[in-house]
Amino acid sequence: MVNTSDFKEIIENAWCDIANISTNTSITGVIDEIMDLLDQGKVRVSEKINGQWIVNEWIKKAILLSFRIYDMKFVYTNCHDSIIGNFSWFDKIPLKFGQWNADNFKQAKIRVVPGAIVRKSAYIAPGAVLMPSFVNVGAYVGEGTMVDTWASVGSCAQVGKNCHISGGAGIGGVLEPLTASPVIIEDNCFIGARSEIVEGVIVEEGAVVSMGVYIGASTKIIDRTSGEVFFGRVPAYSVVVPGSYSSGNVSIYCAIIVKKVDQNTRNKVSINELLRDNYAATSI
């Protein structure tokens, strides 16, 4: 990571004078540099320090300030392709790959399928694969991670290395409030198709989240074996499926930890095998 103390001070001062930010042209160059650093993975909205995820609020402020000072622009692209054709958009944030050529992709060591949209300031690490998907501002996608078809990685969300974000899954984003943590998917996690992880939830290393699991900050995550209840985090190496628990005369949705596996088992056993026998008992 680069030394950002000067940038931080400039952004904090600009934030205190946000009412006049549109007339403060001197801040534009600083924000451009911060967006470039995010884009290159040299700074991050959130990072793990001494085992704890820390939010760099000043970077979120820089992104929010960019929406204040950048002008809306019309962009028209002629792909010269009979299948893709021409397309256009109108936005303040350019696309990450808008000015890239073949050499840029080779140097980045990533694979990007037609239909993948990534906004400037999102970092895509070497070995990552983007199917037709969407990655928003300030997000981080780690080495060897697959973002599958129609999946989305929200603003400032952090996805670790060797993860699989399955088709149609949503990894929630957050810019405001400034103190709110983004969704964090740690290394070696699997997020099943059409699942949604939102509101700053942390999915810890090696966890497997089945298809169609919805987890927010207030969602109960119940360990079927121990009865322990978690909020806001999926413990490391947990296997999680959708379920329900009884509350009076009704059943209320929850996520259920049906088993935990160690790292060796997680590495050796396929995801399907981990999930296959666990749908019979998803009500508590």
UniProtKB/Swiss-Prot annotation:
Chief location: cytoplasm
Localization: Cytoplasm
Disulfide bonds: none
Pfam families, per the entry: Hexapep_2 (PF14602), THDPS_N_2 (PF14805)
EC number(s) on file: 2.3.1.117
Metabolic or biological pathway: Amino-acid biosynthesis; L-lysine biosynthesis via DAP pathway; LL-2,6-diaminopimelate from (S)-tetrahydrodipicolinate (succinylase route): step 1/3
GO cellular component: cytoplasm
Annotated binding of substrate, by residue: R111, D148
Annotated protein name in UniProt: 2,3,4,5-tetrahydropyridine-2,6-dicarboxylate N-succinyltransferase
The organism of origin for this protein: Ehrlichia ruminantium (strain Gardel)
Gene name as annotated: dapD
